[in-house]
Regions:
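C-terminal-of-GTPase-core extension/linker across diverse P-loop GTPases
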Residues: 175-203
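Short acidic, gly/pro-rich beta-turn/loop elements at beta-sheet edges
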Residues: 10, 125, 189
Length: 203
């Protein structure tokens, strides 16, 4: 998750982690809250890892994208991820559960907190919502086990070391990593939600 509103790359990171852990031989599931989903209920199955059961309108675009691009990885939606997590264990034999945007989700215990920090807009203007973009104080970096700096190739006006020093000010133990975001293809917007083949125009 992150401590600011807006896109830091949480969903692509969840996708990458899920694929990597799946390829290690673990049974992994993704638990997504279903942002902007029309579906309402306790546990929604977007995909069982073999078949899609919802479209982007029902599941929300983030959950649908994950389900579309992650074969063999069930994707569940629901506001209470303690419920979706329990369902994943009981029905899919989940060994690893990844929460997409779960840094503020206290109802489910976790073994690791991965905090994403946008190198382009590090901590906004330093103020909490609604005055600023912070979901919680910067000092809450202390909870993270891993801090992933995203979009480091796009950062202008702030050095990576400055960001890392801010992180270390509140958390000396967290592993700090860096990532870049690179688009891979264009998809026609009017058809993207119906396409499950991953086809597009390569960049």
């Amino acid at each position: 998750g992150n401590i600011t509103v807006g896109g830091t790359g949480k969903t692509p990171t969840a996708q990458y982690l899920a694929a990597s852990i799946r390829d290690m031989g673990y049974r992994v599931v993704i638990l997504n809250r279903g942002y902007r989903a029309k579906w309402r209920g306790d546990v929604g199955i977007v995909s069982d890892g073999q078949k899609l059961y919802m479209d982007a309108t029902e599941a929300g675009d983030e959950a649908f994208m994950l389900a579309k691009h992650l074969p063999e990885v069930p994707v569940l939606i629901g506001a209470e991820r303690s419920l979706t997590g329990q369902y994943a264990i009981e029905h899919f034999g989940a060994e690893v559960a990844i929460l997409d945007d779960g840094y503020q989700h206290w109802q489910l215990a976790r073994d690791m907190d991965i905090l994403l920090v946008d190198a382009v807009n590090v901590f906004g203007n330093g103020y909490m919502l609604p005055r600023g973009t912070l979901r919680e104080p910067v000092s809450h970096i202390e909870r993270a086990d891993v801090c992933l700096l995203t979009k480091v190739d796009q950062a202008v006006g702030v050095s990576r070391e400055h960001i890392k020093n801010t992180i270390r000010k509140y958390n000396e133990k967290a592993l700090i990593m860096e990532s870049i975001h690179q688009p891979r293809r264009f998809v026609d917007l009017k058809d993207w939600h119906r396409d499950i083949s991953g086809e597009g125009v390569d960049i």
